[in-house]
Amino acid sequence: MVQRNAKPENEIKAIIEAWADAVRRHDLSGILAHHEQDILMFDVPPPLQSRGIDEYKKTWDLFFKYHKPSQAFDIEELAITAGKDVAFATAIMRCGSGTFSGPPEKGGFLFRLTIGLRNADGDWRIAHEHHSVPSTD
């Protein structure tokens, strides 16, 4: 549960932590709980971009195919900058180690996360997600 009227950075941190927890549990309604209907996401696997909540929702089918509920989806190095109406957060994410918060194992990886949020009437909503990995070329 996200506490309203808290410092914006604390509210946003709680939203991102709840999102990551929902991902770990494969709880699609929890994943979507704080997202705008017109979300725009840039992801690592195709498609290049997903526009709107229905397209965003479809991207999780592929993720759930390879990520098991017992595997990590951990937030590391989270930084949040919040204004009155907009905010952004960046993090390094650990994905796919053998157990929650375990050390990275073969098949696990780190990726970069950037989230953009809008505040509408005191309700922070995720308007943009960008997932990326460094090029190995």
Regions found by a protein language model. Give the residues of each.
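A beta-strand edge to alpha-helix "cap/lid" segment located at domain peripheries
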Residues: 2-30, 40-137
